[in-house]
Amino acid sequence: MTLLSDLGIWDERLVVWANHIVERWPGFDLFIVWLLKAHLPRFVPLILAMCWLWFKPHPNQPARREVLLEALLMSVFALFVARALALLLPFRERPLGHLELGLTMPASLDTGLRTWSSFPSDHAVLAFVLAVSLWRISRPIGAWALFHATAFICLPRLIVGFHFPSDLIAGASLGAALALLAPMLQTRHAITGFLLRAEVSRPATMYSLGFFILFEMAEMFDSVRVVAAHVFKAARSMLG
């Protein structure tokens, strides 16, 4: 038996085991659906922590701000990489699409993600880019961020069958690796230094841009995706 087949067996066993708690307690189902559908409990706490660290006075504040800027840039890059992998790698059906697993879905949950490839989890990618970046600045805040990313962003997606465990582990590993790779890049000081100087010389422009990026991160760039999809469809129809 190959390693991949072993992994597939454990993927299925773990997602079935995690899913068995669905429809046991109505209040728990509502809580899980809220975590999956609402933007507030997922990425907003991580973004608030980033904002707090940005403005909190600290002897090493410039270095902290460099790390936060790296987190912003790597978040955008990481989501691009995750979507590229999902499109380029062989399509992987989400667990909820495997009817033989007999997974139970909360009644109020939208299953419109069936047509999206399951591997890797872009939610896990973004969550762990931010969490590991926060860990680089503050170990206590980083530990909380890693717990939040695991318990409130990744685990609910496993429970309802949006992802297999390997999807989430791959996404988390990719996000963590990119966050740890950022300080090794030779161009990091040039880029973050330019942005920090621009923040001083053009604060209105930079903070407006920062707010836009943070807002889009909080909603997983859903607005940008919708606009891009409409533009793509319009361009394709015009080109015949």
For each of these PLM feature ranges, what is it?
Residues 36-55, 123-130:
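Hydrophobic alpha-helical transmembrane segments
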Residues 107-232:
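Membrane-embedded catalytic cores of phosphoryl/pyrophosphoryl-handling enzymes
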Residues 30-33, 63, 142-146:
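Membrane-interface alpha-helices at helix entry/exit sites of multi-pass transporters
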Residues 1-47, 82-112, 222-240:
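N-terminal transmembrane-helix/juxtamembrane module of multi-pass inner/ER membrane proteins
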Residues 50-82:
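Interfacial segments of alpha-helical transmembrane regions
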Residues 1-4, 69-89, 210-220:
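N-terminal signal-anchor transmembrane alpha helix
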Residues 22, 26-30, 59-63, 67, ...:
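Membrane-helix interfacial "entry" motifs
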